Amino acid sequence: VQALNNANIPVVAVDRSASGGTVDSFIASDNVTGGKQAADALAQSIGDEGEVLVLQGIAGSSASRDRGKGFTDGIATHPNVRVVGQQTANFDRTEGLNVTTNLLQAHPDVKAIFAENDEMALGAIEALGERAGRDIKVIGFDGTEDGLKAVTDGKMAATIGQQPAKLGAQAV
């Protein structure tokens, strides 16, 4: 970004903020509000009571930070829902599978998992096998095609939708 600034080229950031340089315009979903919506959907899916896990995105990224803040703030309004484990899975499906497998060994009685994106949620669903959607609810984020299919198939309780085409159009 700094190189673009030095060349007097306008910079428009879409979906993620820049950590250095100056951005002329920033277009993104409200990830904090989305995180709160995810917390409410998760709590509702488990009858507002139980232990849950959180799969975090890339450490320090604006999306992970904001979605995590929204979820933490939102889940605080549900005192009988407790986050018992959380770990980064870097917005990656395979890491979501592996991290979920490890967290479930330490916390076998969880009722739900919030993943800060659909890719990690889909990895969690793979780790859960037949328990996904039945015994353990999964909430994703992004509203990807695969995520929406998992909701339709009953494997994912919800995904927080984004509209990337609209974000791109606004950026242009």
Predicted features and spans:
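A residue-level marker of the well-folded mature domains of exported/periplasmic proteins
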Residues: 1-172
